[in-house]
Amino acid sequence: WNYGSSAAEVMQPLVQYIDVIFGAEPEYKEILGIQPVGFKAVDAADTTFEANFPAFEEFGRRVVELVPRCQKAFLELRNSITSNHNLLAAVLYSDSTLKHTGIYDIECEVDRVGAGDAFVGGMIYGLIMYPDNDQKALEYALAASALKNTVYGDFNHVTVEEVESLMQGNTSGRVSR
């Protein structure tokens, strides 16, 4: 960011007009000044994620206090175990309720560049396609991001069918044609 003002100085006045906010831990800290709960899961079965749900809910309440117009606060979570082994999860605070995904354990990450964009694109798609199902929209966003980690380059070249297959638990990695 190199525009003569800090990201916080530019974004804080604008954020008051949003209905939906999304980001990872650094964005929430930089723009709103609040530190989300750390995500330190070490594998997909790690229960520390569930143990932190009350803190994630408090985080969501704090976002809504700071941005009263905001109806949905998405938080994408990543714990980098090694340079190519990452754990992903996400939470959504909406209607005074916390929703969460499971944990994706990506052991052979190809390229993480663009994974945040894939999450946001998946979130927008999910909100449009599942307008009355925030849980499904959240799961779609994270599945799109998880799959992007397996694709080289900045763009997510996976299909809707591949994202939905992952959402349904198909993690076999088998090629389907």
Give the residues covered by each predicted segment.
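Conserved phosphate/ATP/ADP-binding segment of small-molecule kinases
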Residues: W1-T97
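Alpha-helix boundary/capping residues
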Residues: I18, Q35, A144, N170-T171
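Conserved post-catalytic alpha-helical subdomain immediately downstream of the catalytic base
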Residues: S83, I103-N170
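Structural signal for terminal/edge beta-strands and the immediately following C-terminal loop/tail
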Residues: S172-R177
